Protein backbone atom coordinates (compact mmCIF):
# COMPACT_ATOMS: atom_id res chain seq x y z
CA UNK A 1 0.00 0.00 0.00
CA UNK A 2 1.24 3.48 -0.87
CA UNK A 3 0.19 6.29 1.49
CA UNK A 4 0.47 9.85 0.18
CA UNK A 5 0.11 12.93 2.37
CA UNK A 6 -2.06 15.55 0.69
CA UNK A 7 -0.11 18.48 2.12
CA UNK A 8 3.11 17.12 0.57
CA UNK A 9 1.41 16.42 -2.74
CA UNK A 10 0.06 19.96 -2.92
CA UNK A 11 3.13 21.63 -1.41
CA UNK A 12 5.52 19.93 -3.80
CA UNK A 13 3.20 20.27 -6.80
CA UNK A 14 2.90 16.49 -7.19
CA UNK A 15 -0.85 16.24 -7.75
CA UNK A 16 -0.60 15.25 -11.40
CA UNK A 17 1.95 12.53 -10.60
CA UNK A 18 -0.34 10.96 -8.01
CA UNK A 19 -3.30 11.12 -10.38
CA UNK A 20 -1.26 9.64 -13.23
CA UNK A 21 -0.09 6.73 -11.10
CA UNK A 22 -3.63 5.91 -10.05
CA UNK A 23 -4.93 6.24 -13.61
CA UNK A 24 -2.30 3.98 -15.19
CA UNK A 25 -2.76 1.19 -12.67
CA UNK A 26 -6.54 1.50 -12.99
CA UNK A 27 -6.74 1.15 -16.78
CA UNK A 28 -4.19 -1.63 -17.21
CA UNK A 29 -5.01 -5.23 -16.36
CA UNK A 30 -1.83 -6.83 -17.65
CA UNK A 31 -0.12 -9.76 -15.97
CA UNK A 32 3.23 -7.96 -15.98
CA UNK A 33 1.95 -4.64 -14.58
CA UNK A 34 1.16 -4.10 -10.91
CA UNK A 35 -2.59 -3.67 -10.52
CA UNK A 36 -4.46 -1.25 -8.31
CA UNK A 37 -6.85 -3.04 -5.97
CA UNK A 38 -8.39 -0.05 -4.20
CA UNK A 39 -7.94 3.71 -4.00
CA UNK A 40 -9.44 5.83 -1.24
CA UNK A 41 -8.73 8.94 0.78
CA UNK A 42 -9.13 10.47 4.19
CA UNK A 43 -9.04 14.14 5.10
CA UNK A 44 -5.27 14.35 4.86
CA UNK A 45 -4.06 11.25 3.00
CA UNK A 46 -4.48 9.30 -0.23
CA UNK A 47 -4.22 5.51 -0.20
CA UNK A 48 -3.32 3.29 -3.15
CA UNK A 49 -3.74 -0.39 -2.35
CA UNK A 50 -1.81 -2.49 -4.88
CA UNK A 51 -1.38 -6.20 -5.38
CA UNK A 52 1.30 -7.76 -3.22
CA UNK A 53 4.69 -8.58 -4.74
CA UNK A 54 6.62 -10.83 -2.33
CA UNK A 55 9.76 -11.02 -4.48
CA UNK A 56 10.93 -7.45 -3.88
CA UNK A 57 12.39 -5.24 -6.60
CA UNK A 58 14.95 -6.04 -9.27
CA UNK A 59 17.51 -3.56 -7.96
CA UNK A 60 17.94 -5.62 -4.78
CA UNK A 61 18.80 -8.71 -6.81
CA UNK A 62 21.27 -6.79 -8.97
CA UNK A 63 22.92 -5.34 -5.89
CA UNK A 64 23.29 -8.80 -4.37
CA UNK A 65 24.36 -10.65 -7.52
CA UNK A 66 26.13 -7.86 -9.49
CA UNK A 67 24.69 -8.98 -12.85
CA UNK A 68 22.44 -11.60 -14.47
CA UNK A 69 23.09 -14.30 -17.04
CA UNK A 70 21.81 -13.66 -20.55
CA UNK A 71 19.15 -16.34 -20.12
CA UNK A 72 17.81 -14.74 -16.98
CA UNK A 73 17.94 -11.25 -18.45
CA UNK A 74 16.14 -12.53 -21.54
CA UNK A 75 13.25 -13.79 -19.41
CA UNK A 76 12.86 -10.48 -17.59
CA UNK A 77 13.21 -8.37 -20.73
CA UNK A 78 10.63 -10.48 -22.59
CA UNK A 79 8.05 -9.85 -19.89
CA UNK A 80 8.90 -6.16 -19.67
CA UNK A 81 8.48 -5.78 -23.45
CA UNK A 82 4.96 -7.19 -23.17
CA UNK A 83 4.16 -4.79 -20.32
CA UNK A 84 5.45 -1.78 -22.26
CA UNK A 85 3.52 -2.92 -25.33
CA UNK A 86 0.34 -2.90 -23.25
CA UNK A 87 1.03 0.60 -21.93
CA UNK A 88 1.74 1.91 -25.42
CA UNK A 89 -1.47 0.37 -26.74
CA UNK A 90 -3.31 2.45 -24.12
CA UNK A 91 -1.55 5.68 -25.11
CA UNK A 92 0.88 5.67 -22.18
CA UNK A 93 4.66 6.20 -22.15
CA UNK A 94 6.28 4.71 -19.04
CA UNK A 95 9.39 6.96 -18.98
CA UNK A 96 10.78 5.58 -15.72
CA UNK A 97 12.00 2.10 -16.57
CA UNK A 98 14.75 1.07 -14.13
CA UNK A 99 15.43 -1.81 -11.72
CA UNK A 100 13.81 0.03 -8.79
CA UNK A 101 10.51 0.08 -10.67
CA UNK A 102 10.40 -3.61 -11.52
CA UNK A 103 9.10 -5.97 -8.87
CA UNK A 104 8.85 -9.75 -8.78
CA UNK A 105 5.86 -11.88 -7.87
CA UNK A 106 5.89 -15.09 -5.84
CA UNK A 107 7.25 -17.21 -8.69
CA UNK A 108 9.74 -14.68 -10.06
CA UNK A 109 7.83 -12.99 -12.89
CA UNK A 110 8.34 -9.26 -13.51
CA UNK A 111 5.81 -6.53 -12.94
CA UNK A 112 6.20 -2.82 -13.70
CA UNK A 113 5.32 -0.38 -10.93
CA UNK A 114 5.60 3.32 -10.02
CA UNK A 115 3.86 5.21 -12.82
CA UNK A 116 3.99 8.74 -11.46
CA UNK A 117 6.27 9.93 -14.29
CA UNK A 118 4.27 8.25 -17.04
CA UNK A 119 2.72 10.29 -19.83
CA UNK A 120 -0.90 9.64 -20.71
CA UNK A 121 -2.98 10.53 -23.75
CA UNK A 122 -0.41 9.75 -26.44
CA UNK A 123 -1.78 10.12 -29.95
CA UNK A 124 -0.45 7.50 -32.37
CA UNK A 125 1.53 9.00 -35.23
CA UNK A 126 2.61 12.18 -33.46
CA UNK A 127 6.37 12.65 -33.64
CA UNK A 128 7.05 14.70 -30.53
CA UNK A 129 4.59 14.48 -27.70
CA UNK A 130 6.16 14.92 -24.28
CA UNK A 131 8.79 17.46 -23.26
CA UNK A 132 9.15 16.88 -19.52
CA UNK A 133 12.66 16.44 -18.16
CA UNK A 134 12.00 13.55 -15.82
CA UNK A 135 13.55 10.38 -14.48
CA UNK A 136 16.84 9.38 -12.87
CA UNK A 137 19.89 10.85 -14.61
CA UNK A 138 21.45 7.52 -15.65
CA UNK A 139 18.14 6.47 -17.23
CA UNK A 140 17.54 9.46 -19.49
CA UNK A 141 17.45 9.08 -23.26
CA UNK A 142 19.39 11.58 -25.41
CA UNK A 143 16.19 13.26 -26.63
CA UNK A 144 15.09 13.84 -23.04
CA UNK A 145 18.38 15.50 -22.10
CA UNK A 146 18.28 17.70 -25.19
CA UNK A 147 14.59 18.47 -24.57
CA UNK A 148 13.74 17.73 -28.19
CA UNK A 149 10.43 16.27 -27.15
CA UNK A 150 9.97 12.51 -26.99
CA UNK A 151 7.48 9.79 -27.82
CA UNK A 152 7.12 6.07 -27.14
CA UNK A 153 10.62 5.45 -28.52
CA UNK A 154 12.04 6.67 -25.23
CA UNK A 155 10.82 3.49 -23.53
CA UNK A 156 12.78 1.32 -25.97
CA UNK A 157 15.95 3.26 -25.21
CA UNK A 158 15.35 2.74 -21.50
CA UNK A 159 14.81 -0.95 -22.20
CA UNK A 160 18.33 -0.97 -23.64
CA UNK A 161 19.70 0.78 -20.56
CA UNK A 162 17.96 -1.75 -18.34
CA UNK A 163 19.21 -4.74 -20.35
CA UNK A 164 22.77 -3.39 -20.25
CA UNK A 165 22.58 -2.97 -16.48
CA UNK A 166 21.20 -6.48 -16.06
CA UNK A 167 24.13 -7.93 -18.00
CA UNK A 168 26.91 -5.67 -16.68
CA UNK A 169 25.70 -4.47 -13.29
CA UNK A 170 25.88 -0.77 -14.17
CA UNK A 171 24.01 1.47 -16.65
CA UNK A 172 25.81 2.34 -19.89
CA UNK A 173 27.62 5.69 -19.97
CA UNK A 174 27.53 5.89 -16.16
CA UNK A 175 29.57 8.47 -14.27
CA UNK A 176 29.12 9.99 -10.81
CA UNK A 177 29.48 13.46 -12.34
CA UNK A 178 26.17 14.49 -13.90
CA UNK A 179 27.74 16.64 -16.63
CA UNK A 180 30.09 13.85 -17.70
CA UNK A 181 27.22 11.36 -17.58
CA UNK A 182 25.09 13.54 -19.86
CA UNK A 183 28.01 14.06 -22.23
CA UNK A 184 28.54 10.30 -22.38
CA UNK A 185 24.86 9.68 -23.13
CA UNK A 186 24.77 12.32 -25.85
CA UNK A 187 28.13 11.74 -27.54
CA UNK A 188 29.86 8.48 -26.67
CA UNK A 189 29.24 5.15 -28.38
CA UNK A 190 28.10 2.38 -26.08
CA UNK A 191 30.94 0.09 -24.97
CA UNK A 192 29.91 -3.54 -25.42
CA UNK A 193 31.78 -6.17 -23.38
CA UNK A 194 33.28 -8.93 -25.49
CA UNK A 195 31.80 -11.66 -23.29
CA UNK A 196 28.28 -10.80 -24.43
CA UNK A 197 26.81 -12.86 -27.26
CA UNK A 198 26.51 -11.32 -30.72
CA UNK A 199 22.73 -11.27 -30.38
CA UNK A 200 22.92 -9.39 -27.08
CA UNK A 201 25.40 -6.88 -28.47
CA UNK A 202 23.29 -6.30 -31.57
CA UNK A 203 20.13 -5.76 -29.51
CA UNK A 204 21.87 -3.29 -27.21
CA UNK A 205 23.30 -1.30 -30.11
CA UNK A 206 19.91 -1.01 -31.77
CA UNK A 207 17.99 -0.14 -28.61
CA UNK A 208 20.57 2.43 -27.47
CA UNK A 209 20.69 4.30 -30.78
CA UNK A 210 20.93 8.00 -30.01
CA UNK A 211 18.58 8.94 -32.87
CA UNK A 212 15.04 7.94 -31.80
CA UNK A 213 13.96 7.66 -35.45
CA UNK A 214 16.62 5.00 -36.07
CA UNK A 215 16.11 3.19 -32.79
CA UNK A 216 14.75 -0.35 -32.70
CA UNK A 217 11.03 -0.11 -32.00
CA UNK A 218 10.55 3.14 -33.91
CA UNK A 219 8.54 1.60 -36.74
CA UNK A 220 6.46 -1.16 -35.22
CA UNK A 221 7.03 -0.86 -31.50
CA UNK A 222 7.34 -4.12 -29.59
CA UNK A 223 6.90 -6.15 -32.79
CA UNK A 224 10.34 -4.98 -33.94
CA UNK A 225 11.95 -6.27 -30.75
CA UNK A 226 10.18 -9.56 -30.11
What does each model-found stretch correspond to?
Residues 3-28:
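Conserved N-lobe beta3->alphaC-helix segment of eukaryotic protein kinase catalytic domains
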Residues 76-77:
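Activation segment signature within eukaryotic-like protein kinase domains
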Amino acid sequence: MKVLRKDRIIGQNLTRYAVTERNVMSVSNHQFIVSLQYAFQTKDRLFLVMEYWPGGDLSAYLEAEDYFSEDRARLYISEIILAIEDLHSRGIIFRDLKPDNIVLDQIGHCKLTDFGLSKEGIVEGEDKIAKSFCGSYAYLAPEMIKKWGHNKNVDWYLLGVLLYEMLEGIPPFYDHDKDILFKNILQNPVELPEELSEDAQDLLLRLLHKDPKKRLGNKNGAKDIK
